[in-house]
Amino acid sequence: MAISALEHATPDMIGTGGATGAGATAILAEIAALLERVAAGGEAVQIDLCGPTCSPQIRAKLLQALGPGEVLIRLKADGESTIRETSVQGVWWNEHTDRYGNLLAAFLEVARVPAILPVDSEQLRRGAERLRADLQTVSKTVD
């Protein structure tokens, strides 16, 4: 499920004008509620950090407030996807850039595990086939 950064925030939480602290506070309050919901068995949620309600200043305040965690994952394809654990367990900072480094998407994911990481059954089967083929090649050169 994806939501905008301030979907459930009340007007007094959002603030006005340059009050980026108030906007970040609203998002952090939303994250706390989402963590409780996911812990109770609810589905994972993504909070869009590139929408019109989430300025670069708010993103910077969120990044500072959430702090770095222990896990950093980089996926390289046509661009780069970076998934960073924050210091708040269950909150993941995701950014996707094109091959030139331009930011395409940024979102916070409240989840046990980021959605991009688990592999499906078909991917597991292909992995087993590849490993078996590699083992045949290795065993011919070792034996």
Please report, for each region that a protein language model flagged, where it lies by residue.
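Generic detector of well-ordered alpha-helical segments enriched in charged/polar residues
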Residues: 25-36, 63, 125-132, 136-139
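Beta-strand-enriched cores of mature, soluble protein domains
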Residues: 31-32, 75, 102
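Short, well-structured hydrophobic secondary-structure segments
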Residues: 34-66
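Amphipathic, interaction-prone secondary-structure segments
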Residues: 57-87
